[in-house]
Amino acid sequence: MPAVSKGEGMRGLAVFISDIRNCKSKEAEIKRINKELANIRSKFKGDKALDGYSKKKYVCKLLFIFLLGHDIDFGHMEAVNLLSSNRYTEKQIGYLFISVLVNSNSELIRLINNAIKNDLASRNPTFMGLALHCIANVGSREMAEAFAGEIPKILVAGDTMDSVKQSAALCLLRLYRTSPDLVPMGDWTSRVVHLLNDQHLGVVTAATSLITTLAQKNPEEFKTSVSLAVSRLSRIVTSASTDLQDYTYYFVPAPWLSVKLLRLLQCYPPPDPAVRGRLTECLETILNKAQEPPKSKKVQHSNAKNAVLFEAISLIIHHDSEPNLLVRACNQLGQFLQHRETNLRYLALESMCTLASSEFSHEAVKTHIETVINALKTERDVSVRQRAVDLLYAMCDRSNAQQIVAEMLSYLETADYSIREEIVLKVAILAEKYAVDYTWYVDTILNLIRIAGDYVSEEVWYRVIQIVINRDDVQGYAAKTVFEALQAPACHENLVKVGGYILGEFGNLIAGDPRSSPLIQFNLLHSKFHLCSVPTRALLLSTYIKFVNLFPEVKATIQDVLRSDSQLKNADVELQQRAVEYLRLSTVASTDILATVLEEMPPFPERESSILAKLKKKKGPSTVTDLEETKRERSIDVNGGPEPVPASTSAASTPSPSADLLGLGAVPPAPTGPPPSSGGGLLVDVFSDSASAVAPLAPGSEDNFARFVCKNNGVLFENQLLQIGLKSEFRQNLGRMFIFYGNKTSTQFLNFTPTLICADDLQTNLNLQTKPVDPTVDGGAQVQQVINIECISDFTEAPVLNIQFRYGGTFQNVSVKLPITLNKFFQPTEMASQDFFQRWKQLSNPQQEVQNIFKAKHPMDTEITKAKIIGFGSALLEEVDPNPANFVGAGIIHTKTTQIGCLLRLEPNLQAQMYRLTLRTSKDTVSQRLCELLSEQF
């Protein structure tokens, strides 16, 4: 080993490390370590005082021994003494030893804290940096108690050097993450926000990380950071600016800072219009740069550019308010779906899953369905295939449900075992949600059991039985299908359960066919009996006693089975008891009693799909971010508006015209009695005392209301405390709205009371009912409220939702307009050109037509215009108008009292950037209101 002088290094340490490495056995290593420990102990206890170099060397040896896994029970005081040295290397080793070996319960903690305080007060940037690093590395609650009040002062002090500011910001971030309750908010918060304008890259990057974390828990304190972050981001991404151009990384200016600024902006709702315009320009610039040819072939360039791009797309999705940006983001991600880099394909699929939840970009996402299906078949990485499954699930609607379900079933046969159960749940949900033909639903679930029976949970096969029982029109087909499926030589046990239950209820519907006579049905089921587990055998015994009631001709055969020793003397108590009771019942009961006891199962009253609940449980606990998941659960096809679902022919089925496939409950009939008291189910209470305390509409409420005219799902309102999300569906004159109240803070909301305020005339035209919500909303959680809606007659105004609650001892009062508008009760109507103009001429009275000529408020994009007309509820009639640039629509407004036909014509003038909208309906008030609503969309 080359000689190392005393001034350049520690020769003794180097020799010791070399000796340890040269040890041939564990015993030799321990012997050498014990020898060194004895030497160090003697040096520390010797009469001769050690100089700083020797202390440093011996402390380093102790540190090395500790890192080898051996206990160290001395040397701590010597390390603490090094903290008071004025030599950098000695102080550095002292802090290193303290950070690694000293715990918060040490008797030396007071001495250590004093040394750290001295260094923080020294104004020596090197010593201050070492002290801050030590505090951050230890990061204990005791450290937070001692220094959480001092570090913010260092951070915002005008004479603090940039390197120390950077360390102080990161140190404070570490303490806040471990002990947020010990970091006081004060005057420094407003000053730390201005660090976003600092010219030192390290300072502004560290400050952005700190502000982002603080803003998530204290949004009101840091809301001024939004405009500063947008301004700084604009200066970075705009090529004309010279801000931080010295920090360009492979032709990408300050990529890490750009990502952090974009992430900070996701902590807040869309900013006010002035700032929003500048932010939109930034996002457009980032999307434009993504389309430019790469300036370097090196991977660092593409990584930096794509990091900024994906964070920008996340912000676009979070705001969900700019249709053009959403569609552009979708198109950009679509290009990445076939990129040679696996990580980019994964990230593109993941981001598109969220984009599919937006009304504006759902159609754009659907255009990539073939690429996603191909990824499902060809990707070698299982995580990418799983994201492809998630995206197919998110983009599914009635127009592509059968194709997507078929592809998922095909993939399920070869899918990785770790994700099979989740795929099974998703297939079951999609098949149920979009089943217009219930024979297809039955076939799909049985195929699901055949392919992945081990992963089909009880919730799935319970659900298919519930739906078959609730629908007369599919019972015969289900019985025939399960009978045929059971004839396979090898059947999964779940198929035996489904088959046994359905044949026990509806086997009589196929008994007329000689190929499925009662005896054949019984023999088929009994051939599987001895291969099944105890719970399945118990179910089959119940099927047998049902057969006794349905088919008297097989009664004797079944009694012989029940009477056999294998049943009456079965080791399992449940099977034995069933055999004894069923045998006795079949022997002593008269035909009438038997028919009464064993009558057909009544329809299942259900409020929530257990399959959907199970999928959510697999995805994690409910939080505010579940609003994004809620958006994905699309129950209405955005491509074609609400579609009719065949009503059940069962006499006991629910009266709702919407076949509630997800079991979310039918719309109840209008109440005939007086409304319940304030603790009851009605949310509408216009005479309540709280009406006098209703707050004015929240800022931006009108804009958010207008956005929901052509969409049914999304975030209606968001501030620093509360997020309100909506998901709604409408069928003819009935509707149902799910409201999600999300607590964005870590503190409980108390006395949480939502109230719906309706004007007198609106209350007579619109019937609204709901159940009360829990008055306590935990931090980071959400509660759901369901409003059942019935349109009695046409209306103009919208109800106002007022939310009152207590947060941190202060009273909060928020009011927003609830987007229940007349067009929600639109039923699209297809008609030929001749029929359209014939009907147009019939509605020629002046009071039946309303026309509006107005300036375009948004870019005049054909596809977005089509999507908005369809989202408005009207059918979009192609090739009807002689001018192909015009848009023509037709539909019927359904109310309880009448149906109102509606025709519309939208004529764009691209040169003048103007529109002319003409509406003709059989009722003048309807024409006027629909014209007002639709005009605001363009």
UniProtKB/Swiss-Prot annotation:
**Localization annotation:** Cell membrane; Membrane, Coated pit
- What domain of life does the UniProt record list for this protein's source? Eukaryota
Q: Which GO terms describe its cellular component?
A: AP-2 adaptor complex; cytoplasmic vesicle; membrane coat; plasma membrane; synapse; synaptic vesicle
Q: Where is the composition biased (Low complexity)?
A: 646-667
InterPro entries documented for this protein: Adaptor_Complx_Large_Subunit, AP2_complex_asu, ARM-like, ARM-type_fold, Clathrin/coatomer_adapt-like_N, Clathrin_a-adaptin_app_sub_C, Clathrin_a/b/g-adaptin_app_Ig, Clathrin_app_Ig-like_sf
Q: How does it sit in the membrane?
A: Peripheral membrane protein
Q: Where is the composition biased (Pro residues)?
A: 668-677
Region annotation Disordered: residue ranges? 615-681
Q: How does it assemble?
A: Adaptor protein complex 2 (AP-2) is a heterotetramer composed of two large adaptins (alpha-type subunit AP2A1 or AP2A2 and beta-type subunit AP2B1), a medium adaptin (mu-type subunit AP2M1) and a small adaptin (sigma-type subunit AP2S1). Interacts with clathrin. Binds EPN1, EPS15, AMPH, SNAP91 and BIN1. Interacts with HIP1. Interacts with DGKD. Interacts with DENND1A, DENND1B and DENND1C. Interacts with FCHO1 and DAB2. Interacts with ATAT1; this interaction is required for efficient alpha-tubulin acetylation by ATAT1. Interacts with KIAA1107.
Q: Which family does it belong to?
A: Belongs to the adaptor complexes large subunit family.
Q: What does this protein do?
A: Component of the adaptor protein complex 2 (AP-2). Adaptor protein complexes function in protein transport via transport vesicles in different membrane traffic pathways. Adaptor protein complexes are vesicle coat components and appear to be involved in cargo selection and vesicle formation. AP-2 is involved in clathrin-dependent endocytosis in which cargo proteins are incorporated into vesicles surrounded by clathrin (clathrin-coated vesicles, CCVs) which are destined for fusion with the early endosome.
> What is the protein's name according to its record?
AP-2 complex subunit alpha-2
The taxonomy runs: Eukaryota, Metazoa, Chordata, Craniata, Vertebrata
